[in-house]
């Protein structure tokens, strides 16, 4: 994934913290860009 994304399963607070910052506060796998409760494409490449 993009180099600015944090590692999968690391803590996140904002959509800029990782490719998929879930509502649970954990980065989802960067290979899964659309997951329930996680960031969607509108959050990417900001």
Swiss-Prot record:
The keyword Repeat does not apply. InterPro entries: Conotoxin-I_CS, Toxin_19. One of its GO terms (cellular component) is extracellular region. The modification 4-hydroxyproline is found at residues 2, 11, 29. It is found in: Secreted. The modification D-phenylalanine is found at residue 44. Expressed by the venom duct. It comes from the Eukaryota. One of its GO terms (molecular function) is sodium channel regulator activity. Transmembrane segments: none annotated. Disulfide bonds join 5-19, 12-22, 18-27, 21-38. Keywords: D-amino acid, Disulfide bond, Hydroxylation, Ion channel impairing toxin, Neurotoxin, Secreted, Toxin, Voltage-gated sodium channel impairing toxin. The cysteine framework is XI (C-C-CC-CC-C-C). Iota-conotoxins bind to voltage-gated sodium channels (Nav) and act as agonists by shifting the voltage-dependence of activation to more hyperpolarized levels. Produces general excitatory symptoms. Belongs to the conotoxin I1 superfamily. This is Iota-conotoxin-like R11.7.
């Amino acid at each position: 994934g993009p180099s600015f994304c944090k590692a999968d399963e690391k803590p996140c607070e904002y959509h800029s913290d990782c490719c998929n910052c879930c509502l649970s506060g954990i980065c989802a796998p960067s290979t899964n860009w659309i997951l329930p409760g996680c960031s969607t494409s509108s959050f990417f490449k900001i």
